[in-house]
Structure formats: structure tokens, C-alpha cells
Amino acid sequence: MRTFPHLLSARSVCNFCLDRNYGHNMNASTVMARLRVRPADHPASVSVRTLLGETAWFSLPATTRARFADHAASAEYRGEFAEVRASFAGRLLAMCCRLIGTPVAPFTGTNIPATVKVFATPDGGTAWQRIYEFPGREPCVVESIKRLSREGTLIEALPACLRMALDVYARDGVLHFVSNAYYFELGRMRIRVLDWLPPGTTHVEHIDLGNGSFRFTMRVRHRWLGEVFYQTGCFRDPASPSASR
């Protein structure tokens, strides 16, 4: 029987997801390997400032600019998700996705303590790791990497070679990331996910709240299924006095 050593079995993935140390084994190489991200042939740093343009960039609060500045790629934010919810279709999709990784939290709840870790990858990308502490469960870890595509546009690398193409813009002092396509990246080949398939359009908002804190809100909405996922929470800057526990 022909084997494919680069593919994980369902059993190994399940064991991997339940590893107590998973959320603490964090460095650029391991995260890139988990997300099957190949180092870029021509590394280029993700610059939100460049993607937005100077006018839009300086319309954002100074604290938002500091969090997304080119030199600010390493930080740890602590806070709480006031709400993590999903529709029936969303919960089903999240549970199925646990066989290939965890692109979205598979559980729901309110007032969920969480930690967000951000750090740079060797090829200029920015890795994001969200650790949810649902009551009575092992920490749930969701990872992704924002990086530039071959064409210089912004994408987010998710588990199982899934990629999400993103538009980024600023409006009324809020930073927005909105998906415009999903595709699987297999080497140099791309297989686009049809627009009518789940999950739908992902919309992330970064809202500065002042006093060293911000709100993260994510909505995923499908054209037919409606709202599939919704998360919102407040987090504190590492330098904020209230960040220490």
C-alpha cells in the first residue's frame, strides 16, 4: 500500500490536539510546520502600514499603529472573550476541522479567559496563536500566520494548507481584515474553494479602547447559512499596568 508520510492520521491529529504542552511549544519553525507553510522564496515582511497606505494608516489611533507597526511583531496579550458562539453549522464545521487542525475554536461560551501570542516568522510573516481556556477543558489553541502571497497581497495561512486571502482597510479609527477568497496551497498549485461553500466571509475588527486595551471581534457569515461564527473579547497591551495578574 502506498503511504503518504506528510499526511497525519486522524488518530495522530487527535492526540496532537490533546497535548497539554501544545500551547506552550511555540516558535516560528514549529508553527510553520504545523500549518504546512513553506518559507517564501523571496521573503517580504507583512507591513500593515504599506498595505493600508499612509493616509489610512495615520487615521488609526497611535496605540493601534504601535500594535501593528513593522517592528512590533512579538507580543503577548491577555484578556477575555466576552462571547464565543457558533451556529449549528458552525459547530459541526469546527468539529470536523479538528481532524486537520483547529482553524477556529470548536467550543462556545461566555467570559472565556484567553491569551493571544504574536511573533515574527523567518520569512517576514506574523504568527498568531490564540489560547482559549474553556471551563473544564484543556486549553484550546488556534494558530494562523499572516504573510504575503507571491503577488504581494495579504493572506492568512490556516491548517491543512488552507489559505485565506484578505483585504485590509481602516474606517472610523477601526482596523478591518476581510476575507475575499479561500484556497488550498499545494506546493506551487492553488485550488480555490468555491464561494458558496462554508465557511463564508470572515470579518475581523481591531478596535482600540484606550487605556492600553483593545477589542477583537470576528464574524464569519455565509451567504445562505447566515452567521456561522462570532467572537468578541477585550485584551490588554503587555505594557499596561493591568496586564499583570
What is the meaning of each model-derived region?
Residues 5-6, 163:
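Short beta-strand-initiation
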Residues 6, 22-24:
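Low-complexity, intrinsically disordered or signal/transmembrane-proximal segments
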Residues 9-12:
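Serine residues within intrinsically disordered or low-complexity segments
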